[in-house]
Amino acid sequence: MTQDYKATLHLPATEFPMRGDLPKREPAMLERWEREGFYAQLRANAAGRPLFVLHDGPPYANGQIHLGHAVNKILKDIIVKSKYLAGFDAPYIPGWDCHGLPIEIAIEKKYGKVGVKLDAAEFRQKCREYATEQIDLQRRDFKRLGVIGDWDNPYKTLDFRFEANEIRALAKVVDNGHLTRGVKPVHWCFDCGSALAEAEIEYADKVSPTVDIAYPARDPAAVAAAFGASLPAGVGVAVPIWTTTPWTLPASLAVSLGAELDYVLVEGPADRGQPRWLVIAEALAAKALARYGVGEVVVHGHAKGAALEHMLLNHPFYAEREIPLLLGDHVSAEDGTGAVHTAPGHGQEDYQVSKQYGLLERYGAAQINPVDGRGVYLPSTPPLRDTVLAGLHIWKANDVIIEALRETGVLLAASKMEHSYPHCWRHKTPIAFRATPQWFISMEQANLRADALKAIENVHWYPSWGQARIAGMVDGRPDWTISRQRTWGVPIALFVHRETGEPHPRSTELLRQVADRVEQGGVDVWYTLDASELLSSEAADYEKITDILDVWFDSGVTHEAVLPDRGLPKPADLYLEGSDQHRGWFQSSLLSGVAMDKAAPYKQCLTHGFTVDEHGRKMSKSLGNGIEPQDIMKTLGADILRLWIASADYSNEMSLSQEILKRNADAYRRLRNTARFLLGNLHGFDPLQHLVALDEMVLLDRWIVHRAHELQEKIVAAYARYDFAEIVQALLNFCSVDLGSLYLDVTKDRLYTMAEDARGRRSAQSAMYHVAEAFVRWIAPVLSFTAEELWGYLPGKHVDNVLFATWYDGLAPLPADAALSGADFDKLLVLREQVAKVLEPMRANGAIGAALEAEITVAADAQTAARWQPLAEELRFLFISGDVTVTAASTDDIFVSAQPTTKAKCVRCWHHQASVGSDPRHPELCSRCVSNIEGPGERRRWF
């Protein structure tokens, strides 16, 4: 009867669960971290180390967090945790952006606009309460993601201290000469009722009307003469313009030409029976005339645009308004007519060229900009012949103006076109340029543009194309409009002279005094402040500005308002946000930083892409393809979400679907099972008593420590350059190849069959201990919950949390004098694959059931054979086969052959050995197993 030898084997045993059960375990860990003050402990443990500051870009305090929020916060968390392991103190202070229109709209929906049910102070208080509620909801979800940080003490742009620091930051900007005030055309949202910054604009397709309008020359003969032409009697001359915004024609004050463009004087369509010649850019003449129904291009003269400067035209429907011809660099011959109708109240280039020619001084504000903040023509807007424009919304006015002009002879062509047009990012509605009195941070006044472009060069951009992208944006951007005509925000706390409109000469000092008061009582202090308290006898000459600061200024000055307050250095080491922030937070922070300190507020800038479904489509409720992070955490756990984020190429769009989540759950199981196998085989191992020195290890064990050392160097370098996908791939490969299909498989024999305290067994356990110690650290930044769980099961004494440790220092490369080098092992592993290929058909045809039933012969050249023959006795353990013979042959190749063994099988180790039955006490065991049970035990050197 077969004796049961199971009790003599040392099979794996661990209480580390096979199933992660993350949705249940993770919340329990979070509760413990909260209870124990984990973040405070982490900071205390890292005290005195070099600082690494990842400064948090504040999400807006409105609505539940979505997948994009999760991507952003988890990427930041991975970096922060990797920095602790790398020996840094890496404080993370989360923040929230709390002012602005979305919160105002939420309060307006409930209480109406300011003055309906609530006065301004009450309205601001409701906004403050709403934002605070939203922060609490978002904070709960961010913490559930496993993100560590100072959640009990975040920065909020609504805090009195922050609001005060923001006003102090404005004082610095003023002090350095960057603030300016003027009536300039700015992006204006009629739904917001306010100016918009560049970052608040997104482009979408819009169908617009296109019209060609003729501006008749006041002195047709003079225009013809500039072309060297003699004008026949009864022939008129006009300059046609092409525009997609007919609603701006009432504000048209000039027509701009290109100084060096070539223009032709051509025969155009008749004007109510009167012949008419037109001035058109030569490159566009044929196309324009075709639009007007003129088939043949008849040219009467050529001239440069410069020859027509200062000549006068008539406005197409305001006969008393003379329209000068100006020269502008913005005019091109790409489309239209080469002549641009110029409305300085509704276009940046129009404004600049009109200012250059002194045109603005000749007109009143209502003529420059006849449109109010709701998009309606002012009461003073003159009619178009019999058509009343006053009170008409500009989007309706387009068709009305076109119809009215059909009767006048100035409408040469009308059509429709779809084109990319600026829209409000909140309302998704078209916006317009509108000249209004605003406060600006000037890009030129104190060299801000040039200084910002220089500062960009001193920042490390991830990906590298980010540098060119933001540089192009800064190079081409207009002045930064920082004023908003809204209620909920930080006031532009300036006093301006009632007559001149100039800021008080002591503005920076006064701003700081106001800031001190705001720090005690919040922004309401500004609105209740009696000017005489600060200005004394001057108070009657000055008035307070009631505009508030752009929310991009709020978030853009966090480097000034937060970091010094928390004892953290400037510039921050890293800013990390979505790729849309090149025109948003990265840029507002850059401009404010350069305006205040002549330097970027960050050393490195990293961007991530947006989340899309598996087909590359944007996730949305209407498509039904959205995946919420809360749902992932409830069903799979935060660690699965974190693994997906780490494994994705976040520099591009990040695809997610249920199938992708399933693949990540499978990858997680592979990592968890590897950890569990390591722990199972470390049962009964105490590193203080049983650890075998590296130079005394069995060579295979020493090799796996060497491989782990190589991998750790790769992983640490990848964390440092934020390449998390490489880390995940390398980890999975290590678990599958180096450990799973090789090392863990080969060492089972030693671990299970040797005596418990045998040197060969303790050697394998020591190697696994080193690998486990390193492994738990490798995964900790990504799989934070699982790493914490695993940390609690490692043998030996440890600090309380894996993040209190640093990268494992127990690994080392193979020494130069090792009996087997890394290259030797590589060759042996190739040989192992060769053996497996030879055995495959034998298994398939039933010649053997398992590799242990085959005896192997390896024939190699004399030098290789001599190198491998000392290993032959143990090669069977590497191949997990029967006995192995190595022979020398006159060949450069290596030949492997195999034959079924005829030897008996040992019931304990399952190896087929001639020694089975040689000991009468154990007739079914091989001599090796007998020795391992009763004798001194076997010795291993190689495998």
Swiss-Prot record:
Gene Ontology BP terms: isoleucyl-tRNA aminoacylation
Renumbered ranges of motif 'KMSKS' region: 618-622
Residue numbers binding L-isoleucyl-5'-AMP: E577
Cofactor details (free text): Binds 1 zinc ion per subunit.
Catalytic activity: tRNA(Ile) + L-isoleucine + ATP = L-isoleucyl-tRNA(Ile) + AMP + diphosphate
Binding site for ATP: K621
Pfam family membership, one: zf-FPG_IleRS
Keyword Nucleotide-binding on entry: yes
GO cellular component: cytosol
Cofactor: Zn(2+)
Task performed by this protein: Catalyzes the attachment of isoleucine to tRNA(Ile). As IleRS can inadvertently accommodate and process structurally similar amino acids such as valine, to avoid such errors it has two additional distinct tRNA(Ile)-dependent editing activities. One activity is designated as 'pretransfer' editing and involves the hydrolysis of activated Val-AMP. The other activity is designated 'posttransfer' editing and involves deacylation of mischarged Val-tRNA(Ile).
Oligomer and partners: Monomer.
The protein's name in its UniProt record: Isoleucine--tRNA ligase
Protein species of origin: Xanthomonas axonopodis pv. citri (strain 306)
Underlying gene: ileS
